[in-house]
Design a protein with these regions (language model features):
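Short catalytic-loop micro-motif centered on adjacent basic/acidic residues
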Residues: 92-93, 148-150, 173
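Phosphate/diphosphate-binding loops
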Residues: 147, 151-163
Length: 339
């Protein structure tokens, strides 16, 4: 018995063997990065992470991929611009998780900043299933919606899109999940769909709707829509939400995603963020002045995901949409209690 206990203690106290993965480094890329002014250690780390050249180290917004490469992005922008000009009711169909919630908040805030009549709906997946189902299409029609916009879902909603069409509703699907052979019969913006030349296949759902909003702003600008009464919005103000959703969805941080996250974190560290994000930092006892990807993935994201355990799954979205600190703090506390 004594021997058994001693051997068990030895196993418990044995240091864990670390598994070190050595990534292959392209020496030519490494030299190019050093020649461009990168520190040799940073150059080696970047070359081992498939950074192809110095341009990929730029984190300016101007280095983002152009939305023109994202298939149907401009088509979606034209339809949304028409809806805004006609003041049609746009209903966003979202999911409650961190990517879906941030995508919904980005969609609502971006559309409203451009004068749209926009609202959202979060299907209760235990009652209605996931995403745009026929039941959700019927509820949307009953609520007076004219155009449905899915965020972070919809690529598999064949039946829901068909039911919406039968009810006279049009649908735009924005999603990033891998499509099956059959896709819904509507406008689809998804970097992973067939024939899409957008190089960042890792764009999160929140990133897809952000690119659609950039295309929409350009389309409205082309129509001379903005004026002194309704000024052109600064979409950079949504990057705190984009960064949060991108990190929390654990998509690979390719160059395009790295720009979105880096810019969002810079804004957070300056205190430029939604009251809901600030409140989530506070309840998680994290310092937003030193915001890191860790905070997004392990402190804020899980608290938004906790809304899935509530009867009302839209509490996470409500927290992100809150326009004042008091409302944001109440909702963040609710999410914190659940987490």
């Amino acid at each position: 018995g004594v021997l058994k206990a001693a051997s068990a203690a030895a196993v418990r106290n044995r240091p864990m063997s670390a598994k070190i993965q050595v990534r292959p480094v392209n020496p030519q890329t490494c030299q190019t990065l050093i020649a461009a002014g990168a520190d040799p250690l940073i150059a080696r780390l970047c070359a081992a992470r498939d950074v192809a050249g110095p341009d990929e180290l730029l984190d300016k917004l101007s280095a983002l991929l152009p939305y023109t490469l994202l298939k149907n992005c401009e088509t979606a922008a034209v339809r949304l611009a028409d809806a805004i000009e006609k003041q049609e009711n746009i209903l966003i169909v979202a999911d409650y998780d961190a990517d879906g919630a941030t995508a919904c908040a980005v969609g609502i805030k971006g559309l409203q900043a451009m004068g749209a009549r926009a609202d959202f709906m979060v299907p209760n997946r235990f009652e209605n299933g996931y995403g745009l189902t026929p039941e959700i299409a019927e509820a949307a029609a009953a609520a007076g919606a004219r155009l449905l916009l899915t965020v972070d879902n919809g690529i598999a909603s064949m039946a829901g899109v068909a039911r919406a069409a039968a009810l006279g509703l049009e649908v735009i699907v924005t999603d990033h999940h891998l499509p099956a052979e059959e896709t819904p019969d509507c406008i689809i913006v998804n970097p992973n769909q067939k024939g899409c030349g957008f190089q960042s296949k890792s764009l999160a759902g929140v990133g897809v709707i952000f690119f659609v909003l950039m295309a929409l702003r350009a389309e409205l600008r082309r129509r001379n829509y903005f004026s002194d009464e309704l000024k052109e919005p600064n979409l950079g103000e949504l990057l705190d939400l984009v960064a949060l959703g991108t990190v929390a969805d654990v998509v690979p941080l390719d160059h395009n995603n790295r720009i979105l996250v880096s810019q969002g974190l810079k804004r957070m560290r300056l205190g430029k963020m939604r009251p809901g994000i600030r409140a989530l930092f506070e309840v998680a006892r994290r310092d937003w002045r030193k915001a890191q990807p860790f905070d997004m993935g392990f402190a804020l994201g899980p608290r938004i995901n906790a809304a899935g355990r509530l009867d009302d799954m839209s509490v996470g979205i409500a927290c992100l949409l809150a326009d004042n600190d008091a409302a944001a703090q109440t909702l963040a506390a609710q999410l914190n209690d659940l987490n």
